[in-house]
Amino acid sequence: MAPTKKPQKNKQSKNEIASSLIPNSGHKKPSKAPKLLISPENEDRLRRLLLNFRRTPSPVTATLSVTQKRKKLNNLYENLSCEGFLDNQIELVLSSLRDGATLETALDWLCLNLPSHELPVNFSNGASRFPSTGRSVAVISKSKKDWNVSAESSVQEVKEVPESEVLVRVKSKRDEEEEDSLSSCQPSQADWIHQYMKRLEEEELESSDDERDKVSGPRSFEVIAKEYCVERYNAIKAKRKGDKSGQSQAGLAICKLKEEMNALGPSEAILESEFQRDRQDCEGAREKEVASSVLDDVHESVNADAFFFQLFDDLTLDTNPVGSCKSEEQESVVSNDSLDDLDLGDLFDEDVPPYVPSPHELLELQKKEIMRELCNEKHLTKLNGIWKKGEAQKIPKALLHQLCQRSGWIAPKFNKVTGEGRNFSYTTSVMRKSSGFGKSRQAGGLVTIQLPHQVEDFESIQDAQNRVAAFALHKLFSDLPVHFAITEPYASLVLIWKQEESLGITSREEQRREKFVESLLEADNFSLTTTSRGIHSALPMVDSCVKENDDLDVVKSNHRARRNSSMAAECSSLKQKQENKKKMQKYKDMLKTRAALPISEVKKDILQKLKEKDVLVVCGETGSGKTTQVPQFILDDMIDSGHGGYCNIICTQPRAITVAQRVADERCEPPPGFDNSVVAYQVRHQNARSDKTRLLFCTTGILLRKLVGDTTLKDVTHIIVDEVHERSLMGDFLLIILKSLIEKQSWDNALPKLKVILMSATVDAHQFSRYFGQCPIITAQGRTHPVTTYFLEDIYERTKYLLASDSPAALSSDTSITDKLGSVNVPRGKKNLMLAGWGDSYLVSEDSLNTSYDSIKYIASAVVDYDLLEELICHIDDTCEEGAILVFLPGMSEINMLLNRLAASYRFRGASGDWLLPLHSSIASTEQKKVFLRPPKGIRKVIIATNIAETSITIEDVVYVIDSGKHKENRYNPHKKLSSMVEDWVSKANARQRMGRAGRVKPGHCFSLYTRHRFEKLMRPYQVPEMLRVPLVELCLHIKLLGLGQIKPFLSKALEPPSESAINSAILLLHKVGALEGDEELTPLGHHLAKLPVDLLIGKMLLYGGIFGCLSPILSIAAFLSCCKSPFVYAKDEQNVDRVKLALLSDKLESSSNLNNNDRQSDHLLMVVAYEKWVRILHEQGFKAAESFCESKFLNSSVMRMMRERRVEFGMLLADIGLINLPKGKGRRKENFDVWFSDKTQPFNMYSQEPEVVKAILCAGLCPNIAEGLVNRLTKPAEETQRYAVWHDGKREVHIHRNSINKNCKAFQYPFIVFLEKLETKKVVYLQDTTVVSPFSILLFGGSINVHHQSGSVTIDGWLKLTAPAQTAVLFKELRLTLHSILKDLIRKPEKSGIVHNEVVKSMVHLLIEEGKPQHT
């Protein structure tokens, strides 16, 4: 007897559920998928919610013909039937899904809509998995409606359910225990499984032996056939002689031979074989006209032929071909009667007409031919080792057991199906292995087989089991002649089943299926016909529609006339105002100033070329005035010519606000956006325009957004693209669109003529001219004075500066460049590449430019030397004439650093400190105006700026320029899969632009903080276009949002097209994130991401953070991820930093977030806590207290300030698309916005204090950066001294970086982490900035999800596997699709900011919170 197992409890504790997620140890990657379970309450609630939500199904794009639809529906019907679903269930799902039905969607629909007890067992409870195969289980079964588990289910008698009702098979308690034992697959159960299977085999063999003993060995067919012919001959002779006694004896012998032949098996086939042979002999005898001496033999043959034919007909046409033989007396009477009626007829008559068989006879002949082939003994060799001719036939159960054993399958198992009365009915289950390759491959798995159209039960258990075993032999071993080896009546049954399949006899199920499929097709055709009729019925209305259209044309014509009249009045008004301004003295003075600019010399040429050509390139040196004057040239010309009302000029300008204000001042008009001002600006968060606007300065992004609603720009007369030489990503993208518009209007005269002006500050204008078909170029000379340039070696000599050994700008006190280069094994020719990281002081010393430059050897050129900057500014202030100082630094953090140092010095205290002016794009425009003012006499103005002051902004009184040689540009980090601002050296063109800023009013001086060698040999001639160095995902989203076609063909039209690999990488990432689907179709998520000008992963995180009500922590995490620096400053003693991190999570402040109470296994939540504590101290105690906090917690205060700026920037972006609301009446200060975004009472922060929700959204943003843990396995990496947990990222073994808070963890809440980036060394791959996330987060927000319904498992992103019942897995999949539908609805209603209250969103949040609660024993 098999060993018993303890029954499993109905409910698992949460600790058991959590522990089931821990994978086995000892493998390179998890060998068994973690098991996922949710509470029944949550599952039921989610299912009811999703069924009530009624998500709109995805539209079907592919159109199929009727034949293709029929084939598709038949295949689906067959596949679902094989999976164990009932006909009415299959018809229900196919009727619901119609053309959108696939096997996957149908299984999803069934798992979602059917109760658990109406599904095949594998779909409701997950699949059993066997050690030998590991394959999924496919079930063919029927069960009872109103399923109820009962301890007595194996013996309890249940009334038969009508066929019209849904049937679901009930498993006995013993069966369930056995299946559970097999599904567990634990190594400790191997002995139990082996013993259990051995017991089953012994029982089957004992049963088969008992049956075999009851069957006597039959004689061979040849012996029986020979005796049969002899007895038939004797019967004929006795009849001819009138011997009644002889006829009776022959009849009795014939009856016994018939019984023996029936016991042998396929009696119909035997008789058919004899009939064919004797018939041929008879026909041969007829053709030769045999002599009368053999007439008796011919008569005997003919009569035997007739008997065989009649007997075969009786057997083949009888519904029960194998029946009990009649009694001997009855058979004798029948035989005698048949012999009396025997007559040769006109067998030997001549002139017999040719025989033409009827259709029925043809069918009968076909049946006989099939039977003859089936009974051909040449196929017996296939049964070698199982049965051979002459051996006793076996019962079907025994033969099935042996064939399964030979195939390496687990022994068949018979399951009782309860029926009415005391009769019996059984099904059999066989676990098959997969076999074959390619198209001939057959999947393995558990197959449960039931008799077809079973209308009777069987009074004997053995009979019922042998019947279903015979059918299993027919289904599973159809290529074997099993009918030879099994006893009657089962052999005849197998032959009948084979004959039905060969003749294509349609069963009742097939008839039902065909009828259903045709009804679906007819319904589709009716729908199409109705549509067609609707179209035809609408034809009589064409005349009335044409009349309405004519009326509409009249209305449009009247509107056009009124508009023209209004425009004429506007043109006249603008011209009059222009004439009045020319009389104003202020305007006259301004005209004189404008006329003195170099660009005024080519004014006539510009206007003339624009009349002749559609595209013009204007190239002017810095200070020529092209940015402010060219737009005014065009506007003034149109106003003076009386067409000012039609004028609509858009100028793309990175510094739109400043330039617009400058132009408005020059025109003596009110500020942009006010009444009577034709100048306006529009940037991301500010819009200063009115109905009177005729000249708009905006960013490239604003113009692209306008293109979404107006792809032809029909109302725009001129587009001026300034600073095209900067080669920004969106700038080059805009050029592709403008070129397409120009080409389109060249052959379509109906389109308005758009004029395009490209303005560049460099001499590389010919490249743009060639791109637009050799368009004309107009060059204006710059107005500059000579500029003297001092390089780093000159600055050291002039200031006598000595680099301190402990300065941050020093490499080290004991290591020189020569030592560092010597330690690197690279050829001498590659030393220049190494110098890019350590500076070029080594080449300075080699060239022996000056012997006093010893300090330069130790300069780390990657670091800004603030000591040198401060000393140089003081040196200029002390030794040089008056004039403003312009300092170029890479970014805002560097600007703040230098400002703080200067403000703290004695020199710039008092009034002088008021003229320390920062200049950055994030500074308010009102504050930027001060840089154009002149300071009081005796005070030097110091402007500290980024590259904003490089081209567009011209500050007239600047005489001295200090150039750090650095700037920040957008770069793609392949490790982080993020784009970020990276500090790098400027190009030669950029450096010359900065030098030129010193010679605006008089000869100037430029102090370059890099060597002459770097400028002449190492700097690039021009900046690399962004399209060639940044990820293209944002650009691809804009292409799809604007409906510009396929991505690759469009980008191939660029000025410098990106590589195909870069395009493919972007498209692949968009598909993985869920922004694209199918053939580059934009999803609702992609539609929203296209409107967020941020990195793709951060954009997705922000979007979901607003939807799921945890915006504030997500803003902090997104700001942290987007910063290029870590907020933690790691001291030499890293253990102090680790202790501080733990203290941040442990120490609580009053009213602070409770994130730190619920979860400590997250570097990202650590940053949330750190930021919240820092900003609280900043608001309550001030700047100095916040600085002290940063010092005590090893935090970088500049990074914390940068995070606050990014938080505000990201929050404003979400407000722009209508996802959240902005405060009213609180001003535009960043502090106010940051407080608003942190307000826990706002709907978008409803769940901001729930760690599981925050981590789920973090998972959504960082996917596919997921790793699965081998939690029970510890190993010591090659570069470590301790043993740590091992993780797997789907490709290889990885480890958590030592700077992560999770590094020293030995027990994890879940075996899954998300991470920001990988750090790869020679031997180990590390994960930085990790967070432990739940499997529910991965199922909801991870990569692509693939549900394996039969095996009860889920695959995420193609590699991460979880074990979950099909119904549970489908729930999560449907939740994803429902969220997709919500995002789609948000597109139509962007102002619907209360989406956090959506019932589906609330249910998803509730699931994450409930299932993520701490486990208690």
Swiss-Prot record:
Family: Belongs to the DExH box helicase family.
Name of this chain's protein: DExH-box ATP-dependent RNA helicase DExH4, chloroplastic
Enzyme class: hydrolase
PROSITE patterns, A to Z: HELICASE_ATP_BIND_1, HELICASE_CTER
Binding of ATP, residues: 620-627
Residue ranges occupied by any Helicase C-terminal domain in the UniProt entry: 868-1043
SMART domains found in the cross-reference section: DEXDc, HA2, HELICc
Transit peptide: 1-61
Any Pfam family hit: OB_NTP_bind
Signal peptide coordinates: none
Highest taxon of the lineage: Eukaryota
Region annotation Disordered: where it falls in the sequence: 1-37
Domain Helicase ATP-binding: 607-781
InterPro entries the record matches: DEAD-box_helicase_OB_fold (IPR011709), DEAD/DEAH_box_helicase_dom (IPR011545), HA2_WH (IPR048333), Helicase-assoc_dom (IPR007502), Helicase_ATP-bd (IPR014001), Helicase_C-like (IPR001650), P-loop_NTPase (IPR027417), UBA_DHX29-like (IPR056890)
Keywords carried by this UniProt record: ATP-binding, Chloroplast, Helicase, Hydrolase, Nucleotide-binding, Plastid, RNA-binding, Transit peptide
Catalysed conversion reaction: ATP + H2O = ADP + phosphate + H(+)
Localization: Plastid, Chloroplast
A single cellular component GO annotation: chloroplast
Keyword field contains RNA-binding: yes
Ranges of compositional bias, category Basic residues: 1-12
The EC number(s) this enzyme carries: 3.6.4.13
Molecular function terms, GO-annotated: ATP binding; ATP hydrolysis activity; RNA binding; RNA helicase activity
Protein species of origin: Arabidopsis thaliana
Annotated motif DEIH box, positions: 722-725
